[in-house]
Regions:
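Pre-NBD coupling/linker segments of ABC/ABC-like ATPases
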Residues: 1-42
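ABC ATPase nucleotide-binding domain signature region
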Residues: 6-8, 41-104, 180-181
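Interfacial catalytic loop of ABC nucleotide-binding domains
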Residues: 46, 109-114
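GG-anchored amphipathic helix commonly corresponding to the ABC/SMC/Rad50 NBD signature/C-loop
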Residues: 65-66, 120-139
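Loop/turn-to-beta-strand initiation segments
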Residues: 136, 164-170
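Walker B catalytic motif
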Residues: 138-149
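Conserved hydrophobic alpha-helix in the ABC-type ATPase nucleotide-binding domain
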Residues: 153-158
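H-loop/switch region of ABC-family ATPase nucleotide-binding domains
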Residues: 173-176
Length: 225
């Protein structure tokens, strides 16, 4: 069980404009602080987890607090072909299999530099590299920069790749539609600051209850500022 109580403070300089706004709206420096508290209880055995919620609900902050050792930061791509940016201790056959496993199957694109790839291709390359380098991966903004068709294909490919290699993958996303495609073993919803389920067959029940809640105007927010 992972308990957290995170207070996020901002270093605000009290300039003339800042002081004027604070005075006009009766706002204090402390009001800019954010607090996130809750508990993530992971199953004994799992391969895929999902931290999901609206923007500003603390997804990345919480993930870095709990899964910082496996957080995937911006990779450095310096070669003219992305295949040469993969780990040096990995064979070409392993790289090719990994590219295919994450849905990066365009061989001509393997020969291109990272900066000319599409957003969807970049995401797949990042995933492939992370999987080649780590056994446990926490991936921020998962599917955030791709259309939903690409997101669906990527989720299905990632599910198969992670389970086949028996690795652990934590996706961080604001998109609830990936629950059905990614099929995570557990979900932490930052809108409610609680575990939603840890059993795969409860996913449909959760999605249905969420739609009903939104249609009824349920307030899902739970952030202290």
């Amino acid at each position: 069980m992972q308990n957290f109580n995170i207070i996020k403070k901002s270093d605000i300089e009290q300039t003339f404009r800042v002081a004027k706004v604070m005075s006009d709206f009766d706002v204090k420096i402390e009001h800019s602080n954010e607090q996130f508290n809750g508990c993530i209880e992971l199953p004994e055995k799992w391969n895929i987890g999902l931290i999901v919620g609206a923007s500003g609900t603390g997804k990345t902050t919480i993930a870095k607090e709990i899964f910082n050792d496996c957080f995937v930061n911006n990779f450095e791509y310096t070669h003219k072909s992305v295949i040469d940016d993969m780990p040096k201790n990995v064979s070409i056959d392993e790289i090719e299999k990994m590219f295919y496993s994450v849905g990066f199957g365009s061989v001509p694109s393997w020969l291109k530099p990272y900066n000319v790839l599409s957003n969807g291709e970049k995401m797949r390359v990042d995933l492939a590299r992370a999987l080649l380098e780590k056994d446990k991966i926490c991936f921020d903004e998962f599917t955030s920069v791709v259309d939903r068709n690409v997101a669906q294909t990527a989720c299905i490919a990632i599910n198969k790749a992670i389970k086949k290699q028996n690795k652990q993958f934590i996706a961080i996303s604001c998109h609830y539609d990936i629950i059905e495609w990614l099929q995570p073993d557990w979900i932490f919803d930052t809108n409610k600051m609680q575990m939603v389920f840890t059993i795969a067959h409860d996913q449909k029940k959760y999605l249905q209850s969420r739609v009903v809640g939104e249609n009824n105007g349920t307030n899902l927010g739970n952030i202290i500022i």
